């Protein structure tokens, strides 16, 4: 018995040099759409992270296609899970007034998409 409810494909993109807050803002637009609508939306969003998320979702589509069903189309699949978690932080310092060092935290994130 073949149950399509449990067939999923997942992709994790790690250590992206974009802040988690910026990526979550884009993922909030994309969740619960069909893949065709989500990819179309990501093409026209003017944010830096939309290209990375576009590639991650497209990769999860091809993983699903290769592993489960070769004849599946973009309209039949939906994004079930899309999240961004914080990654390791690169810590730098910048000289500040009166001989102090001012910390600079370059944030990274991990993106997980599941269809």
Curated annotation (Swiss-Prot):
Its main location: plastid. InterPro entries: Ribosomal_uL22 (IPR001063), Ribosomal_uL22_bac/chlpt-type (IPR005727), Ribosomal_uL22_bac/org-type (IPR047867), Ribosomal_uL22_CS (IPR018260), Ribosomal_uL22_sf (IPR036394). It holds the Pfam family Ribosomal_L22. PROSITE patterns: RIBOSOMAL_L22. It comes from Euglena longa (Euglenophycean alga). PANTHER family: CHLOROPLAST 50S RIBOSOMAL PROTEIN L22-RELATED, LARGE RIBOSOMAL SUBUNIT PROTEIN UL22M. GO terms for molecular function: rRNA binding; structural constituent of ribosome. GO terms for cellular component: large ribosomal subunit; plastid. Belongs to the universal ribosomal protein uL22 family. It is found in: Plastid. The keyword rRNA-binding applies. Part of the 50S ribosomal subunit. HAMAP family: Ribosomal_uL22_B (MF_01331_B). The gene is rpl22. It comes from the Eukaryota. Keywords: Plastid, Ribonucleoprotein, Ribosomal protein, RNA-binding, rRNA-binding. This is Large ribosomal subunit protein uL22c. The keyword Plastid applies. One of its GO terms (biological process) is translation. Signal peptide: none annotated. This protein binds specifically to 23S rRNA. The globular domain of the protein is located near the polypeptide exit tunnel on the outside of the subunit, while an extended beta-hairpin is found that lines the wall of the exit tunnel in the center of the 70S ribosome.
């Amino acid at each position: 018995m073949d149950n399509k409810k449990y067939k999923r494909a997942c992709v994790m993109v790690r250590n992206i040099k974009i802040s988690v807050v910026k990526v979550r803002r884009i993922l909030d637009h994309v969740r619960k759409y069909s893949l065709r609508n989500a990819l179309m939306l990501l093409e026209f969003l003017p944010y830096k992270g939309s290209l990375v998320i576009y590639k991650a979702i497209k990769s999860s589509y091809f993983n699903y296609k290769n592993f489960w069903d070769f004849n599946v189309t973009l309209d039949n699949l939906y994004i079930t899970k899309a999240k961004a978690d914080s990654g390791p932080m690169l810590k730098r310092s910048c000289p500040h007034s009166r001989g102090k060092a001012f910390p600079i935290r370059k944030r990274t994130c991990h993106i997980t998409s599941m269809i």
